[in-house]
Regions:
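Sec-dependent signal peptide recognition
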Residues: 2-8
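A ubiquitous, low-specificity "background" feature that marks scattered single residues
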Residues: 8-9, 114
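Hydrophobic h-region of N-terminal signal peptides that target proteins for export
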Residues: 10-17
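Extracellular and organelle-lumenal recognition/adhesion modules and their flexible linkers in secreted
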Residues: 20-193
Length: 193
């Protein structure tokens, strides 16, 4: 009986893991008034339509995957800014109606135009005065976490979801230049509190 219950719970957990996790990446350049041209590679994309002022939608993008499974996959989208400057790239999981149905995603690395961004493999870290570990050049909100061995082949990774996102700033992006932003991701379990 215990074995049957254990197998049933494992099956439910695996289904929940795959059913709820969809990686999402947002860029918002409203403050900079930097119009973005966005092209889908293997992610769906749109503007940030939840922003009420439709006139600023052209300064935003949101790209997301379909449901992720337990295998690592590489996903990407391409953005071209109309002005030179910094571009903030947010990494999260897709929104769901309730917090407990918002899945979690592991991000193994981030590349731009085929090159690993500075510390895009999350190897270098720093610790806040509160003791939270962050990958150098990245910011982790709330319960987003650095996982030293959570990546592909035991490398470092970050764990994110919709309310607990990771952030990276592409510095000095050039106007009119296309930037293909690539992530290696997979579905993950929620962190232990």
């Amino acid at each position: 009986m215990k074995k049957l219950l254990t197998l049933s719970l494992a099956a439910v957990a695996a289904f929940a893991l795959q059913a709820d996790s969809m990686f999402r990446s947002d860029i918002n350049c409203v403050k900079e008034q930097n119009e973005l041209t966005v092209k889908s590679d293997n992610m769906k994309f749109d503007r940030q339509s939840w922003i009420k002022d439709k006139a600023v939608h052209k300064y935003t993008s949101t790209a997301w995957t379909g449901k992720l499974g337990e295998d690592w996959q590489t996903v990407s989208y391409t953005v071209t800014p109309s002005k030179s400057g910094n571009i903030n790239i947010n990494m999260m999981e897709q929104w769901a109606k309730t917090a407990d149905t918002r899945g979690w995603v592991l991000v193994d690395n981030i590349k731009i135009n085929g090159e690993l961004v500075p510390n895009g493999d999350f190897k270098k870290t720093w610790k806040s005065k509160e003791g939270k570990v962050y990958p150098a050049h990245f910011w982790l909100n709330h319960k987003a976490q650095y996982i030293p061995d959570g990546g592909k082949d035991g490398s470092a990774a970050i764990l994110v979801n919709h309310d607990n996102s990771g952030h990276y700033t592409l510095k000095n992006a050039e106007a009119g230049k296309a930037y293909t932003i690539q992530f290696t991701v997979k579905a993950a379990e929620a962190p232990m509190d």
